[in-house]
């Protein structure tokens, strides 16, 4: 650990500082203000003749990003969470003894606490003239080379802390993410929704069609499943008497990783008694309008080279109409299982003959429609067979009162009128078991306790989930989900695998 020559040199400097009575890792160093506050508060000197105010004695802190020694003085650039600032100090300003120590031991990457006044250099740069410079933290590992930075994408994800040090834009993206979550939370609170927390470990893998992570509870001696979705617990709360609830939290799916999938991801799910899925679509449009406004993005934004128009209302189109309009498929084909199988095979797609019509229509949708839905589009009235928790349409028993929101070829939200008929729900679970036996690994398990909860009576309810990660990708114009997750899942390095062996 820390065994290369540059790291060893820095360790020696840390030891030298200790020998001089200077702790390279001190505590209780308190800064007065951020660098942004310093710039804003003292910008008035730019309008003055002398362009300095020596009556100020402000304390700031930051990481050294640049260091330039010019004879008896040092110019440095420090950076904190928000911005950067040039600092200047010399033998005269900090004293010859301290200056000599700093000149020898300060390095790029170190964190310093600086006290001084604002001034403008001869080259016109707003700066801080330091009277005191204290080492706050000695960095042992050198930062990547300035002009090339940390450009290897794998290293950026594996060492996010270095990525954040070197790339200001990365920090800004995660500030946006934090703001998005905060805005969503306040949006639902202002609508009268109650924020709740439900279990992360489930006795049954349910709430969505996906493959779960399995763990074991030693004390109870039973398997547990990291939650795929919180849906069934949130609906139990509606049964219990709450009428509007939401949860922002992690979900886990033991599936592949790609540009839009990470094994653990963040969602918001919300359930609203005495409302329907049309109300949810209206609410979703309102939420997007709020986010775009608060993030100063306007009604049209760019994502992956495409311009997306968020003007209301969003397009609403039935599942089957989307297959025809965007997929270019004939109406008679999408209603015929054999024709669908022939079409899929002819175009080189996998086609499981055991799947029923609704699942095959979903194969058509995934392969011919989804990527063509660029502007916000609500696809409504899904096949009932792929909607095991949705209410069945009164007008067509093969259709679920369900929608998904697609933007730029990606699903962003899924919502529906909740199935509250316990007998129908029980039969749907049985169908899911049949699907699992036919080879569908993602089919839901039977959850008799949930069916029993419905037996006590759940009021007419609409529920929806929105993927926070994909939403942030959209709002920050990021192509990969790993760009909006602080510490995304990564394949183990060969060295890590060898250690386990």
UniProtKB/Swiss-Prot annotation:
Q: What is this protein called?
A: Lysine--tRNA ligase
Could you list this entry's UniProt keywords, alphabetically sorted.
Aminoacyl-tRNA synthetase, ATP-binding, Cytoplasm, Ligase, Magnesium, Metal-binding, Nucleotide-binding, Protein biosynthesis
Record GO terms (molecular function): ATP binding; lysine-tRNA ligase activity; magnesium ion binding; tRNA binding
UniProt keyword Cytoplasm, yes or no: yes
Where do the annotations place Mg(2+) 1 binding? 404, 411
Which PANTHER family does the entry mention? LYSINE--TRNA LIGASE, CHLOROPLASTIC_MITOCHONDRIAL, LYSYL-TRNA SYNTHETASE
Which enzyme class, named as a word?
Answer: ligase
Q: Which residues form the signal peptide?
A: none
- Gene that specifies this protein: lysS
- In short, the EC number is 6.1.1.6
| The organism's place on the tree of life at top rank | Bacteria
Cofactor info, note text: Binds 3 Mg(2+) ions per subunit.
Do you know which NCBIfam families this protein is assigned to? lysS_bact, PRK00484.1
Q: Which GO terms describe its cellular component?
A: cytosol
- Subunit record text: Homodimer.
Q: Where in the cell is it found?
A: Cytoplasm
Q: Which cysteines are joined by disulfide bonds?
A: none
The text of the family note is: Belongs to the class-II aminoacyl-tRNA synthetase family.
Q: Which reaction does it catalyse?
A: tRNA(Lys) + L-lysine + ATP = L-lysyl-tRNA(Lys) + AMP + diphosphate
**Cofactor(s) this protein requires:** Mg(2+)
